[in-house]
Amino acid sequence: MVLRNPEKKGIASTLDERSGEIFRRIVETYLESGEPLGSRNLSRLLPMSLSPASVRNVMSDLEDLGLIYSPHVSAGRLPTQTGLRFFVDAFMQVGNLSAEERTSIERQVRRADRDQPIDSLLAEASQMLSGMSRGAGLVITTKSDPVLKHVEFIRLAPTKALAVLVGDHDQVENRIIELPAGITSAQLTEAANFVNAHLAGQTIPELRSQLEKVKETVRGELDALSQDLVERGLAIWSGSEGDEKPARLIVRGRANLLEGLEGTEDIERLRMLFDDLEKKDSLIELLDLAESGPGVRIFIGSENKLFSLSGSSLIVAPYRDSDDRIVGAVGVIGPTRLNYSRIVPMVDYTAQLMSRLSR
């Protein structure tokens, strides 16, 4: 379910039982409360008998390895980002969702009416992840190709028109198109009627793949100016062959990330994070991260440049369509002290559910 780092497994093998147990207790206390754990309290929690002085010696070794640190003099210890990654890769036990939890996820996601646009389903998935994780639920979807339902060309000026494409779910795409010189309003109507009669029921990529055949049909039934207009319309709707970019980011539960923040600097860093997430390049990067390995991926703090300033973590997994193509990703954004072992199976199951519903 989660990618493991073999190098971290190697480090784990160098720790003896007491070092591993002390490290695990420090991290688990941090994830539960956010508080540092001191040697005196640690010695009481350990299953083996160790004095506070012996615990401090082990903690010193763990500090030398870069796994823990002291936030200030005489304080207990907290995990570093390296320590958190080490814990996730080598120590974390990922449980399974209960039947009740799986049912709850399905019920919440399926609240969206199947006759409604896919955006309703995505919004429900994002809201569900936010509510169950107490973080921000994230859904990224690639741009879907609408099935052509209706086309219209509306003249705006002697040399410009608005090309309107209506898809099968009544989604509308508008493009400004340069008109062939001398084309009449009657020819605009003729071109639109041709598209609606002969090309409706197909997606733009499907039309693009048989463009030469379409051109031959156009030449056989339309005059030269109307032919030119139809070909221009197909070209401007199609875009370039590699222009399939993530089109939508849905985030729910942003307010959850404000809990526990102190000072305007922390809030400003979080605001910058969400501003960055709205940028197209960031969406592409997030989707690439989800695609970079099988199953759920975990990115802690500065491991991902998008989250380095805000100190946030991302747990993300891709979902697929009926052709097994990755068409989006679901995930959770939260502080570095997320409950990783609980959220990982939640994200994994949601991605599986989204894959089933996208088929």
UniProtKB/Swiss-Prot annotation:
GO terms for molecular function: DNA binding. Coiled coil: none annotated. One of its GO terms (biological process) is negative regulation of DNA-templated transcription. SUPFAM superfamilies: GAF domain-like, Winged helix' DNA-binding domain. Keywords: Repressor, Stress response, Transcription, Transcription regulation. InterPro entries: GAF-like_dom_sf, HrcA, HrcA_C, WH-like_DNA-bd_sf, WH_DNA-bd_sf, WHTH_transcript_rep_HrcA_IDD. Negative regulator of class I heat shock genes (grpE-dnaK-dnaJ and groELS operons). Prevents heat-shock induction of these operons. Belongs to the HrcA family. PANTHER family: HEAT-INDUCIBLE TRANSCRIPTION REPRESSOR HRCA (PTHR34824:SF1). This is Heat-inducible transcription repressor HrcA. The gene is hrcA.
